Structure formats: C-alpha cells, structure tokens
Amino acid sequence: MKIIKHAFEKFDERTFTPEMAAKLVHGRCLFRRSNSFPDRYIAIGEVDGKIWSIVLEKDLYTVVTARRAHKDEENLWHSR
C-alpha cells in the first residue's frame, strides 16, 4: 500500500494510522466508485468499532485520504 503525503497529514489529524488502513483494506470492506472523482474508489469498513472510509486511486493501491464514513456510507456498510 502506498500512502501519499496528504493522507499521512489527514491520518494524523483524524487519529487514523497506516496500520488501521491496512486492517480496513485487507479485512472485510466494501468498495464503491467515488461520485466526485470517477478515477477513485472508496473502501468502507469497520476498524476498532468505528466505520471509516479510505479514498484510493484507481490502482486500488494508493491511499489518498481516510475519514470517518459519511452517514450514507455507514448505512451502506450496515445493509451489506
């Protein structure tokens, strides 16, 4: 997994770690295409009891950013 500088900055801001990103991506997660950026994907999953979203480049290897899941993403996760 490649993590760009912006993602590291956001990880620190949001108390998210590279280990948490690996746990989410390599565990059970949902992938969906980003509505805002068609060349990016969003991985949605649960880490440490919280639902997170990781934005990935189209190679599904490069992490752009991570954030707590939006409400619609949480609903999608719970309805899987």
Q: Which ranges hold each PLM region?
A:
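Ribonuclease/tRNase effector modules and their secretory precursors
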Residues: 1-80
